[in-house]
């Protein structure tokens, strides 16, 4: 679920960067996505997008699926409940952890995706 994902991001990065910073970053962070990721953070978003696609193939609705999780230290941890909930939670938790490890390059925020994402 998008709202839970936002909170997971805050958990993983210890509140150092608001989730909205990732909405228009690179070629894959935010709606849509195409081309080659511009950096490691953008690659995290592509992996997350691909994970959601796989969840959809399994009959799940990733953007709408509510799941159970908790913030343990600086790591989101999923609480197993059902196949879809676990799948989507794992997608979001992995992405949040990936975001926390990747550098944020302000030059890759709000880029011209038509020219840079081929």
Swiss-Prot record:
InterPro entries: PLipase_A2, PLipase_A2_Asp_AS, PLipase_A2_dom, PLipase_A2_dom_sf, PLipase_A2_His_AS. It is an enzyme of class 3 (hydrolase). SUPFAM superfamilies: Phospholipase A2, PLA2 (SSF48619). Expressed by the venom gland. Ca(2+) binds at residues 28, 30, 32, 49. GO terms for cellular component: extracellular region. Binds 1 Ca(2+) ion. Gene3D superfamilies: Phospholipase A2 domain. GO terms for molecular function: calcium ion binding; calcium-dependent phospholipase A2 activity; phospholipid binding. It is found in: Secreted. Its cofactor is Ca(2+). Keywords: Calcium, Disulfide bond, Hydrolase, Lipid degradation, Lipid metabolism, Metal-binding, Secreted. The keyword Disulfide bond applies. It comes from the Eukaryota. PLA2 catalyzes the calcium-dependent hydrolysis of the 2-acyl groups in 3-sn-phosphoglycerides. This is Basic phospholipase A2 PA-15. The lineage of its organism: Eukaryota, Metazoa, Chordata, Craniata, Vertebrata.
